[in-house]
Regions:
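N-terminal structural segment of carbohydrate-active enzymes
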Residues: 1-72, 82, 87-91, 126, ...
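Hydrophobic faces of well-ordered beta-strands that scaffold small-molecule active sites
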Residues: 28-30, 73-75, 160, 189-191, ...
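Short, solvent-exposed turn/loop segments enriched in Gly/Ser/Thr/Pro and often Arg
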Residues: 28-38, 77-86, 163-169, 192-197
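Core domains of carbohydrate- and sulfate-ester-processing enzymes
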Residues: 69, 87-130, 218, 222-239
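Conserved alpha/beta catalytic core and glycan-binding cleft of carbohydrate-active enzymes
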Residues: 90-92, 96-97, 173, 177-240
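Active-site neighborhood of glycoside hydrolase catalytic domains
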Residues: 121-199, 219-220
Length: 240
């Protein structure tokens, strides 16, 4: 739960930057750091560091310190959904049909939510504390790209890990790829992918890489059982 108390915990990363450099680590991946309702994946504001971690200025100093030690920063980009406390969704809760943000989400005013909002909306995989964004709405895409631009220009981040990338609109990922490459050449996009054909989103137009859970599972299962059938099947399915 977000208690609203500001504690600069994120500054502790500066205690480890020299050690990371000593290890030869050249990048660090952070879980969601922006203001959220609870655990970080339920974002309230993409432009403000969560007060439980500190302030924007705290994170800016952390990024400068990590870069000084040749460590790049990859943030968790949670673009599929937001929290119920997200500013645009709160506007819809208040104004209903009259909200200019009602089309930012997948909403039906013919139903009701489990929170009795007076309208139904799509949550991520049935989790209604995670309100699904409408990534086919140009206004939503423009807003998210503006946030990414701010992260690059203000903090100097070097890449994004896209949460539940298998749920993201493909045209959105194409737009994000070209936008980031133009803004910062070499910017990395890594997708969280659980299943399916990874080649659909890991290509020259969308993501550079992804989390290959299928092969990860195949590797440890095959090695533990001393039976290479599972990893051979996964490798052949993906790359054969």
């Amino acid at each position: 739960h977000n208690d609203g108390v500001c504690v600069p915990r994120i500054r502790k990363l500066m205690d480890w930057s020299e050690y990371l450099q000593t290890l030869g680590e050249d990048s660090i991946l952070l879980n969601p750091i922006f203001e959220s309702d609870n655990h970080g994946y339920d974002t309230r504001d993409f432009k403000t560091i969560d007060c439980r971690l500190g302030t924007n200025e705290d994170f800016k100093e952390v990024c400068e310190d990590l870069h000084k030690h040749n460590v790049k920063i990859v943030l968790d980009g949670v673009f599929n959904h937001v929290g119920r406390g997200f500013w645009a969704f709160k506007d819809v809760q208040e104004k209903k049909w009259d909200s200019p943000y009602k089309d930012w989400f997948h909403i039906s005013f013919d139903g009701n939510s489990c929170y009795n909002d007076g309208f139904w909306y799509e949550g991520w995989e049935g989790h209604f504390e995670l309100v699904k964004l409408n990534l086919q709405n140009p206004a939503v895409v423009d807003y998210l790209l503006d946030c990414v631009k701010m992260w690059i220009e203000e903090f100097g981040i070097d890449g994004l890990r896209l949460d539940v990338a298998y749920c993201l609109d493909h045209n959105f990922m194409r737009r994000l790829r070209s936008f980031c490459e133009e803004l910062k050449p070499g910017f990395a996009l890594i997708g969280e992918v659980l299943f399916g054909d990874y080649n659909l989103i890991v290509n020259d137009e969308m993501l550079h890489s992804c989390t290959n859970y299928e092969c990860y599972k195949g590797i440890f299962s095959s090695l533990n059982c001393m039976n290479m059938l599972e990893i051979a099947h996964s490798m052949n399915r993906q790359f054969g």
